[in-house]
Amino acid sequence: MTADKDKDKDKEKDRDRDRDRERDKRDKARESENARPRRSCTLEGGAKNYAESDHSEDEDNDNGATTEESARKSRKKPPKKKSRYERTDTGEITSYITEDDVVYRPGDCVYIESRRPNTPYFICSIQDFKLVHNSQACCRSPAPALCDPPACSLPVASQPPQHLSEAGRGPVGSKRDHLLMNVKWYYRQSEVPDSVYQHLVQDRHNENDSGRELVITDPVIKNRELFISDYVDTYHAAALRGKCNISHFSDIFAAREFKARVDSFFYILGYNPETRRLNSTQGEIRVGPSHQAKLPDLQPFPSPDGDTVTQHEELVWMPGVSDCDLLMYLRAARSMAAFAGMCDGGSTEDGCVAASRDDTTLNALNTLHESSYDAGKALQRLVKKPVPKLIEKCWTEDEVKRFVKGLRQYGKNFFRIRKELLPNKETGELITFYYYWKKTPEAASSRAHRRHRRQAVFRRIKTRTASTPVNTPSRPPSSEFLDLSSASEDDFDSEDSEQELKGYACRHCFTTTSKDWHHGGRENILLCTDCRIHFKKYGELPPIEKPVDPPPFMFKPVKEEDDGLSGKHSMRTRRSRGSMSTLRSGRKKQPASPDGRASPVNEDVRSSGRNSPSAASTSSNDSKAEAVKKSAKKVKEEAASPLKNTKRQREKVASDTEDTDRATSKKTKTQEISRPNSPSEGEGESSDSRSVNDEGSSDPKDIDQDNRSTSPSIPSPQDNESDSDSSAQQQMLQTQPPALQAPSGAASAPSTAPPGTTQLPTPGPTPSATTVPPQGSPATSQPPNQTQSTVAPAAHTLIQQTPTLHPPRLPSPHPPLQPMTAPPSQNSAQPHPQPSLHGQGPPGPHSLQTGPLLQHPGPPQPFGLTPQSSQGQGPLGPSPAAAHPHSTIQLPASQSALQPQQPPREQPLPPAPLAMPHIKPPPTTPIPQLPAPQAHKHPPHLSGPSPFSMNANLPPPPALKPLSSLSTHHPPSAHPPPLQLMPQSQPLPSSPAQPPGLTQSQSLPPPAASHPTTGGLHQVPSQSPFPQHPFVPGGPPPITPPSCPPTSTPPAGPSSSSQPPCSAAVSSGGNVPGAPSCPLPAVQIKEEALDEAEEPESPPPPPRSPSPEPTVVDTPSHASQSARFYKHLDRGYNSCARTDLYFMPLAGSKLAKKREEAIEKAKREAEQKAREEREREKEKEKEREREREREREAERAAQKASSSAHEGRLSDPQLSGPGHMRPSFEPPPTTIAAVPPYIGPDTPALRTLSEYARPHVMSPTNRNHPFYMPLNPTDPLLAYHMPGLYNVDPTIRERELREREIREREIRERELRERMKPGFEVKPPELDPLHPATNPMEHFARHSALTIPPAAGPHPFASFHPGLNPLERERLALAGPQLRPEMSYPDRLAAERIHAERMASLTSDPLARLQMFNVTPHHHQHSHIHSHLHLHQQDPLHQGSAGPVHPLVDPLTAGPHLARFPYPPGTLPNPLLGQPPHEHEMLRHPVFGTPYPRDLPGAIPPPMSAAHQLQAMHAQSAELQRLAMEQQWLHGHPHMHGGHLPSQEDYYSRLKKEGDKQL
């Protein structure tokens, strides 16, 4: 019952008396509290948090809702009831009753407010209550008393707490009293470190032998598991948020009885936050059958039956030997062991090791015992085996492997290992071997459950110091949430202000009705009350049974521009465990407490320590402390570790509660590699993610489990940070040998700039020194035509993160890219401190916030203009260089401008393949704050210092044509840098920093078509449109600003810098809106020949780091039993393990033997290869001799043929000189067919098709000559006939061809039927050449092995004999086959039969024909794509043809069509067609016979149109198909040689390459 407040004096006296009594009891309780082993926090702990923070849950409500609503709430919600507590007459408080009549008693499990909207409630059990007078708190802390929050579960101090005594009228407490409670913590699964929980999951899985499904597979039940702890804290009663039930289960199998009811949890294990270990809860007192041992029935002692006590024991030693004798014996035994060891190992050191081992001593003593303590006998026995067999010798390699596998699988359960894997070993042997094995190097990476080995690292990392800055308000102002949802004030002020609360909608369940609205959950989204309370209680948003469509207004565009200012990032990655893994480090790790745990300085430290997802977001209302910490930080920043800055950079990007006021004091820099002092995103990843790597753990499983946060594959709109805090890469970067370390200082900037200064490049290409010393620092890696002005006031020596560079939020049509915050990839590779290289400097005289420049209403740019690009300047970004993986020297930009002889493989290439948003970036190069549509991630091979400060987020230009010549110099994963061929009206891509390098040999002026309304300079990056050519030394051409006409850039030397014409118009200040704007002409992209590029020579040596000059010493530095380390270079205090030391195995060691064997093996292989090579050379020589013999025969035959009656029709001898033909067997000059330069419009499709239409090696004239043997071309004058041949209307010609085809097919079928009659030889008529009576030349050709005329072949029109119609052919065919006279009759019959069978099978199986010529079906399919236009029209005509149709005679009907048939250079008459071509074949004939257009006499233009080219190409492809099919037949003839000529091999390789190309 409630005590009355009357004013009479009696009650006043009683009240005073009670107060005195209470104070005495409180003092006693405090003394006993201090004597207790468990730690209780003083008032500076949780109580002071709530006393000072003006915090309550409903205050969050006020922040979440609009201002009008909060004012309305505070006006109309007076408290209904008063909170009160009950206590006994001894002063002990037995219960606390809230205004909602919820009764809390000691022992209850309760929720406690966690302060942060994205953190669930803490769960604890109340130990006891105590009342503290506020005056005690006031004397310790200057904090004001607790104010009345507008609508809250009012803390006791805001009301006079009413006491309920058993007498019924307890005195009223003072308004300044606070009711505190001691609580014992339970830890949620998400609050223990990730690796610890993962090991638990793994152990549970391994120990689950029953195959039963574990209860934690249910995600709901999994989230209900807690871990009890013995840690006690003190909290204010106002933090209570409800009661819950917590059940205990003995193991995970018993937990299947748990039912996930409302407010119910369970625990099995305990968690110790000091040691970061889970342990069983067996220390608790448990009663019941499940916790008691079952003892067997009592067995009476056996009756004494005369057995001695030692009857079943084995005596191993009788201490009867004198010490002197024993020592002499042991000395002799060890000497024998030393001798034996020396004999085995080969060195005295091995003998000493063998003698000093414990095994040797034990063996000697055992032998002495077995010899009845006769030293002589024992020594005689020891001579046979002076050294016992080592334990490792008793185990085979396979057994060791199985043992290690068992350790990994079952831990140190040796019974299980023996049972499952090593049944032949005893358990004792396993244990003995384990203790031997655990000391071997192999055990370091295979240790089972290494999580217990990291505690010292954890303790060091997680320790907080009292100087930790706590300057973050408990919750940011509501305006910081504006960009996170469409329910922000900005969105609704203009349109939905009349809707008031109706405009809100829960971002999880999409309800529009709720008691209040808050941002909460892991992603800080707007939630209704039910969803938020569910999240607060259970750590996850409630499941949605009935999905509801979101209201339409929720799809308003999110304001991406606001993303950077508030530092908010709606990170859709896994912050759940990572961000909360620090759990209660805030309240546990304060070193101020006597037992090592610290009471939280305030509640926000605790909550942010538990799971702060921000970089350094802890709050304090103590402004003095904040100022002191700021000044202390400034001092610390003078010496910054690059690795720390990388870490800080990541945290800065990850921060979700920082504002511009805190940015200057955010980043503390310490020299040691330790955790950030403030709980950060890096700390939040997992409590030991960094510690694993600090310790150097090489266990990939540990690293993998410790870095569980995953980076998003494709960035969401606010997802611009790389959440992966993998410090393995940090260490990798840290241990990289510094590629380039040079003293900082720029050409025109003072080299004596203090480390804290930031060097800001001035916008625009202002004149500067023409030579820049090689710099390793990014501050100087800018083009030489940019002066670096230094802004170094003392007040701004600390590193300013982006607040000064954030552009004002403008309604520009394209969201501006946020500036790159700092280059971690460059600095992490340089161990010496370079703080001046980070950050972008304070807002100095060159302020970068030129907002109006961005307000041009032009069309939205696909590349997104950065504000810096408007001024021609930008901070140095961390865009990693697209350096080759094999590149050993990574040059900054200024060096690429200084080293024109740099070889291509060491050229720092621009990051070309930016169009890969699916590739995860290296975790050490986080993508800075840039809006999402442009936030393409870097591909993984982009690592290393960026040679150009290119904006890493530019998508590639839309029309890119890969530069094919670059592909050979790129790693396989890198695409060739694109050559910009896009139209000139493309909006400008912009770059934050002017690309360096002024020695581009290709004069490619950049495309510049700026927005007409843009006043400032738009820099055109050379990376996107014009990548630096690998063969061209130096960088891209200098950038001409859009305000001046572009000039062609001459190739500049190493120290020359071309100056754009308007550069003088650009002021050296930061703002250039007044720069004169010159109209820009359309830019001509002029492709120059690559011959201009000099052959790159060896690069000049890179500038050395500040370490001492190395001196060659070559002294042995360390020796072991089998090897010796030699120190080759001495660098003083610096050293590099890869270059300064080398390793030499000793002569007799195993490694030396292995190396000798490897050398011998390599020698033998080299000799074998040399022998094989010599044999091949001999074979080739013989082959060449045979070829020369054939050539001579062919020439003789050709001379005979040239004297025939066809001489009158031969070509003009003046035109058949070297320009028109090659020697007969001259191989092509290159391994790939030389392609003449394409003259004509740049249309890739036509260009490709025209290459297909080139004349082929196989051209139809002489049948007896193989197609792959180069011959002289046909009549060059044939080019004059081409216009006449192609002037016919194609449709008329096609129709005539089709009719003629049908007629000829009928004739051929009739011929075939006639020939198949009995009495005729089985040989297709098409196999016969012209009868000698028709072709006089043929007579001579048939009597020689090869007919190769030395000059021009017969005139192409000679074949069209007027009388040689199909009937004439039939007459000639009936005259009998014209076989070689030298062939015997059986040879003839066999040749005819084999040929007929082969041709019949080939015509019926097109795939076989293709495979015979090594053409894959894929290639054939590809051919159809190119040839279906004309060639497939005849397909239906020949499907029904019976019998084998010779593939060489009927061009448009036989077989599959091979359109893309590559060929070596040279134009050959076709040696395979002896039959006279038909008329339509003659139309195609010039395509095979004509030279290239460049070979035409005079200046005759090529007369073929594109349509004719296509038609000729298709006809040719059909011809090629049949020629290919004939190839096997040619090889089968006895007069043909079997080996491939060079041109033929060339031809095959080209064919395969073409076949491998993608369609």
Curated annotation (Swiss-Prot):
Swiss-Prot/TrEMBL keywords: Acetylation, Coiled coil, Developmental protein, Isopeptide bond, Metal-binding, Nucleus, Phosphoprotein, Repressor, Transcription, Transcription regulation, Ubl conjugation, Zinc, Zinc-finger
Residues in coiled coil: 1148-1205
Residues found modified as Phosphotyrosine: Y1252
Cross-link position per record: Glycyl lysine isopeptide (Lys-Gly) (interchain with G-Cter in SUMO2): K559, K636
Biased composition (Low complexity): 478-487, 608-622, 736-761, 890-900, 961-971, 1054-1068
Localization, UniProt: Nucleus, PML body
Residues with the N6-acetyllysine modification: K1150
Modified residue annotations for Phosphothreonine: T119, T1111
Domain ELM2: 283-386
Residue ranges of domain SANT in the record: 390-442
GO molecular function: chromatin binding; sequence-specific DNA binding; transcription coactivator activity; transcription corepressor activity; zinc ion binding
PTM sites of type Phosphoserine: 53, 56, 141, 303, 593, 599, 612, 641, 655, 674, 678, 1098, 1105, 1107, 1259
Zinc finger (GATA-type): 507-532
SMART domains given in the database record: BAH, ELM2, SANT, ZnF_GATA
Any one GO BP annotation for this protein: cerebellar granule cell precursor proliferation
Domain (BAH): residue spans on this chain: 102-282
InterPro entries: Atrophin-like, BAH_dom, BAH_sf, ELM2_dom, Homeodomain-like_sf, SANT/Myb, SANT_dom, Znf_GATA
Subunit structure: Interacts with HDAC1 and ATN1. Interaction with ATN1 is improved when the poly-Gln region of ATN1 is extended.
Name by which UniProt lists this protein: Arginine-glutamic acid dipeptide repeats protein
Protein source organism: Rattus norvegicus (Rat)
